Amino acid sequence: MFPFCDSSSPMDLPLYQQLQLSPSSPKTDQSSSFYCYPCSPPFAAADASFPLSYQIGSAAAADATPPQAVINSPDLPVQALMDHAPAPATELGACASGAEGSGASLDRAAAAARKDRHSKICTAGGMRDRRMRLSLDVARKFFALQDMLGFDKASKTVQWLLNTSKSAIQEIMADDASSECVEDGSSSLSVDGKHNPAEQLGGGGDQKPKGNCRGEGKKPAKASKAAATPKPPRKSANNAHQVPDKETRAKARERARERTKEKHRMRWVKLASAIDVEAAAASGPSDRPSSNNLSHHSSLSMNMPCAAAELEERERCSSALSNRSAGRMQEITGASDVVLGFGNGGGGYGDGGGNYYCQEQWELGGVVFQQNSRFY
């Protein structure tokens, strides 16, 4: 059985009393100590199938040996409970932050080196890269010239081109200097990077501003050219879409009316020609039309222009009425369907006489008006 608290066994004493250590010393770990109770959790977890009788026997054997003799024996080395003290958290954090900072700085330096591997130059337009990309045609011509000159670098070819065209560049610079005066007094640089000698006089060392040096004789030529070809006035954004005035709208309406009248006249002409063809086909080559039919046909042909004039008059009246009601001029879009029919009792031209009727259908302001008129 397990020992109880009231037993006189030395195993009932605390561990630090058994080892004769001071109470202020750190507490030892029971799982790693020499004396371990049989029922301790580390021992039981290590081997759950360990026989209980063997555990009790080993505890009794340990009781037979005094703990003082075991501790004081020279065979057992005395080891410290903690070989190395844990490092403070502040030192670990400082080391980690230092490592991260050094890594970030290296990454930034590497990124900067990858981003800008070539040095840039400062120009009037700001910082610019020394590299440039040529089009296909220009690149072919450029490298052909480089092969002819025998240069091994593109910079030498460009320098040769600049030296060759130095006179033309100086003329351009003189023209710019004559048109614009530099107020800050800063001297410009020539093609080869030195001070421009065009700004200095040959005899003396005093300089003049750019506005007073060469190129003054070209000013009148530019002025005369500008006076000869005046530029058209620029249209502002507000005048781009101007609303037409009343006269322009009235003229547009008048042109629309003329087009509508011409369309009606052409329609009447087509209808008259179609009627003549049908009448000739109905009469036949053997039957000659009588005098009544001829007079009827001639009167019908004479009535066609009258009907057209009447239609135009009605259109004019309807437009005037709509203008009065609306209070302003409106363009009337009308769609007229004219149906002409000729017939008699026998279904053609005969003694019964002819009947002519005109059916009109007008659309005014979304309302459809239908009117039938007959002419005998």
From Swiss-Prot:
Residues 290-299 have a biased composition (Low complexity). Residues 179-266, 280-299 are annotated as: Disordered. GO terms for biological process: regulation of secondary shoot formation. The keyword Transport does not apply. Changing residue 320 to P: In strain: cv. Illinois 101, cv. Illinois 14H, cv. MS153, cv. P39 and cv. Tennessee 8. Changing residue 268 to R: In strain: cv. Gehu. Keywords: Developmental protein, DNA-binding, Nucleus, Transcription, Transcription regulation. Changing residue 187 to N: In strain: cv. Assiniboine and cv. Missouri 17. Changing residue 358 to R: In strain: cv. Canilla. Changing residue 88 to T: In strain: cv. I29, cv. Illinois 101, cv. Illinois 14H, cv. P39 and cv. Tennessee 8. This is Transcription factor TEOSINTE BRANCHED 1. The lineage of its organism: Eukaryota, Viridiplantae, Streptophyta, Embryophyta, Tracheophyta.
